[in-house]
């Protein structure tokens, strides 16, 4: 029969919280993509370059994360998964800023609701919020300890009413300044009362001279994703100037290593990307550039 001392020690051990998962691990354990959201429905499996982005978002020591992204890099799914983690693990006021109201409605209906509905850890996590007349509102939801608002940048007056700890902004280059101010700056001001705020901004650049995401990236540690050459092992960012092909035959495209000039075929790309690493070129704010050809 266990002694009182043994019982006490076991009780104290049971009170110790389990080690916190990295956000990338939590996403792969808890998030399920349903049919219609992904061509590969089922539990999320992150690409190697996505894992560090996720872990930066989940790192309490990092206030801002900026991603310069190509057209399709899985950022929306990553954003929704990170949002889900805050709902489940760190309840707080959350704001998602998108360019237009149509984007907001599409995001809620096509991504948030299906993913939350398909993921057992999130089922019924978001309740419908009611406006002053008692009607449910599509873009405002509450959950224990926090709330979620999805707001259009084209209506900056909506930002005045929300103080939030977590701010997600997608397609920032589609957000134009109004007579009042930049909607991005207005949204960031709504986080200033929270010392532990989190600001995540991502976009595909549109015009380099006026790009919101490139401006934010320039203020970050400017990380780039580098992969090893199968021939010489040197790390390089995969860039379009290093892609070559036979005249009139684009299907022969291959990558020429800038270090050893070896020409590497497409079949090596998955293993190269899997062995890749992010490298910071400046060490202040976490920022990732995924506009290369990975």
Regions found by a protein language model. Name each.
Residues 2-294:
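Phosphate/NTP-binding elements of NTP-utilizing enzymes
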């Amino acid at each position: 029969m266990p002694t009182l001392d043994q019982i006490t020690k076991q009780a104290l051990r049971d009170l110790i919280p389990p080690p916190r998962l990295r956000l990338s691990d939590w996403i792969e354990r808890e998030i399920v993509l349903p049919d219609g959201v992904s061509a590969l429905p089922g539990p999320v499996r992150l690409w190697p370059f996505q894992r560090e982005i996720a872990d930066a978002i989940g790192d309490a020591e990092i206030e801002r994360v900026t991603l310069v992204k190509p057209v399709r890099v899985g950022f929306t799914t990553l954003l929704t998964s990170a949002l889900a983690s805050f709902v489940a693990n760190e309840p707080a006021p959350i704001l998602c800023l998108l360019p237009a109201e149509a984007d907001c409605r599409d995001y809620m209906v096509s991504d948030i609701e299906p993913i939350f509905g398909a993921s057992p850890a999130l089922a019924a996590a978001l309740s419908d919020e009611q406006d002053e007349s008692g009607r449910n509102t599509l873009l405002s939801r509450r959950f224990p300890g926090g709330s979620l608002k999805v707001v259009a940048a084209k209506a900056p007056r909506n930002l005045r009413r929300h103080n939030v700890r977590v701010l997600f902004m997608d397609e920032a280059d589609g957000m134009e300044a109004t007579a009042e101010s930049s909607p991005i700056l207005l949204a960031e001001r709504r986080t200033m009362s929270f010392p532990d705020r989190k600001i995540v901004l991502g976009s595909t650049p549109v015009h380099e001279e006026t790009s919101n995401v490139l401006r934010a990236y320039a203020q970050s540690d400017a990380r780039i994703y580098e992969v090893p050459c199968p021939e010489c092992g040197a790390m390089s960012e995969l860039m379009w100037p290093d892609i070559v092909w036979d005249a009139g035959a684009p299907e022969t495209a291959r990558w020429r290593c800038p270090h050893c000039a070896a020409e590497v075929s497409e079949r090596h790309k998955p293993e190269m990307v899997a062995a890749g690493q992010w490298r910071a070129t400046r060490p202040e704010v976490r920022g990732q550039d995924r506009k290369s050809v990975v």
